[in-house]
Amino acid sequence: KKAFDRARNDATYGWDGSPITTARLSAELWAQIKDQDWSLVSDVAFVSRWPLRLWSFDQHYQFIGGAGGFGEGYGAPAAVGAALANRKYGRLSVNIQGDGDMMYAPGVFWTAAHHHIPLLTVMHNNRAYQQEVMHIQRMADRHNRGITRANIGTTLQNPNIDYSKLVQSMGVYGEGPISAVSY
């Protein structure tokens, strides 16, 4: 109980910031799914493990766990596969999808549409292969080279990718981007 209370308090830092924090993304998503029969079918490492800190996991199937395939485009195909398994139970499959990871295999959303695989995907779009950006920044700093060029070949901008249009072109409902929440 104390850990959940502390996590909920920690999640409030930067709550109204833009872009939306991964804590708020996770908290807002939890508020929408908590009364459903749901399964988190994505890893949590790239969203600072907020779902594990804020959500209540009380069924064995509610989290498929991490893959270890970081940076290799594992997320979206794994989510679609898990959603396929959940389909026969009528379970809501939830995927918090990183943008860089998705760009390895975006065609998997065509597969989901073609085979009528229900999946709620929320894109965490930081416009970068962020794990790689941070690694390059650490290495540049370690070798006293400065971090100003860490974005070369690691960012997904100019042009920015419109993920809602990308998935719409494959037959999937897409909406966004959402850069701020207002009620």
What residue spans do the PLM features occupy?
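Active-site diphosphate/adenylate-binding microenvironment
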Residues: 2-85
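Thiamine diphosphate
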Residues: 50-183
